[in-house]
């Protein structure tokens, strides 16, 4: 067996998780990754391995921090849930009651629930004129979003708000927080700091570069050929049609969100709540673990936890996502399990995958928080075979 740098710890009974994680490096060509699991508030898996910098060969260390791309959306949604729990926000209220400028151009009756569940028809970014990294910060784009016009009748169907969902959550948080904090500050001060968890939406200047994993993504013809089979064919067709909702919601002509740009501090230090969250993977698992175990430290209300754990309320036309071009289930900012995209042990699970195969979620059935982060970004979202293998091993250990 090839030598591989895998370190960390697993509790008794979870040895198979460590074995499967090691196989990701010896058999499945994982570059660098970390995985952590918390159950009932206690850490049972804390593993890391490979290299944090695929260019220099620097080894992944215990406190390496890694970007998790769209998994960031789940943490933004957790901040939204905390705001609901504290009575600052109501999922059933119209967005315009918190953000009057939003209530124009057919958006007057959109509820917070519809917006956070990707049903509002506000996914497209092709008219936003995003030219530089700073333009991706919520503070810079919110006024443009207020004037947007829905692409479909809100509530009739859904489509992944790939870039915009985090901005909308961020602006709502700023408007309802009595202190007017940004989402990144609200999350850090009310959730991450309370749980002693290092995860940021907006990286502080105090974090040294040496702790940051370097991402290697799809940035050359050779890389495209290597990973093209990982991207669903229907989505590829969408990317190739510039008039499709897929292209208009996801294609980035200026390449601002190209994978390699997440190696640049000017990208990581802004607040782009749909995609630039970064932290220790154990921190991600511990945060979801707090929600999965009832949120006692954060004093979460039972009603908001019931909402997060409830089956998704699908739009009138059903589960087909008109941006991702597959059947998906969303609820108040999170992915929910659905056939073909399952995770957790029942419909009560909630979380979010990210580009290349990161995944962070809560499984209330086991009071479990799970996180997997990596730095080799291919075409997978939630069906990365490396992450899946480790996740399945976790559940075999729970039987």
Model-derived features with residue positions:
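A short acidic/small-residue loop/turn micro-motif
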Residues: 51-53, 376-379
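Active-site-proximal alpha-helical segments within enzyme catalytic domains
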Residues: 118, 165-172, 271, 275-296, ...
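Alpha-helical scaffold elements that line and support the substrate/ligand-binding pocket
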Residues: 37, 41-42, 67-90, 115, ...
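Short, gly/Ser/Thr-rich active-site loops of penicillin-recognizing serine hydrolases
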Residues: 293-296, 309-320, 380-399
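Active-site helix/loop module of the DD-peptidase/beta-lactamase fold
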Residues: 62, 67-71, 85-127, 146-147, ...
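Active-site Gly/Thr loop motif
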Residues: 217-281, 310-366, 399
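Short, conserved catalytic-motif segment at the N-terminal edge
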Residues: 5-68, 90-93
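Flexible glycine/proline-enriched surface loops and loop-helix/loop-strand junctions
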Residues: 61-63, 148-155, 167-170, 264-273
